[in-house]
Amino acid sequence: MEGQEDYQLLYEGRRSQPAPEEQEASALPRGRRQRGVEAGEGSVGREEARGHRRSQHRDRLGGGSMGSNVIGLPGVNPPTSEVVVLEPRSFDEMAQVIQYLRERKTVIMNLTLMDPAEAQRSVDFVAGGTYAIDGHQERIGENIFLFTPSTVTVSTPSSQGMPPLQRPLQSPTPLWPSGYEHLQAVGQH
């Protein structure tokens, strides 16, 4: 409350007797009057009062440092990221993919339902759009691609200094006989 009382005294003291510059300025036309008062010494007191109020406000919020003018807004949450998973059937759907990227949404495209030539054309088109918005692209599987806007960073094990996962060159041998071999063995007994 002490700050509010100081403000009241400062405000009442400033308004009770107009400064000589304000009296002179009232005789000037309106546009010149505003500029003259702002440039005159009367504005220095107002600026000091504003600075005093700002520092009190900062102290109340607990951010007494002069280096930051950023304050948090209560009730405002940061925007959430959205991932869109698509299985397009034709090249005509690629314009919508670009729109998702422009809206800062991550897109995963599964192109297994498309003709291979049209799928290649689609990937090239979306890759060009992704490049234009400084986005990122990654192939994450056979005919499956990840496209992200510039606000999303894609990291892979190799980019983090971890060894990449080793994939087997051939399918593992089963530990039990397949059903067909088992049927042959039963028929021979």
UniProtKB/Swiss-Prot annotation:
Family under the similarity heading: Belongs to the SepF family.
Gene Ontology BP term (one): division septum assembly
Taxon lineage: Bacteria, Bacillati, Cyanobacteriota, Cyanophyceae, Synechococcales
A Gene Ontology term for the protein's cellular component: cytoplasm
Keyword Disulfide bond attributed: no
Record has Cell cycle as a keyword: yes
Record keywords, A-Z: Cell cycle, Cell division, Cytoplasm, Septation
Known function: Cell division protein that is part of the divisome complex and is recruited early to the Z-ring. Probably stimulates Z-ring formation, perhaps through the cross-linking of FtsZ protofilaments. Its function overlaps with FtsA.
Name the record gives this protein: Cell division protein SepF
Subcellular location, principal: cytoplasm
Quaternary structure and partners: Homodimer. Interacts with FtsZ.
Pfam families: SepF
Region (Disordered): 1-75, 155-174
Source species, domain of life: Bacteria
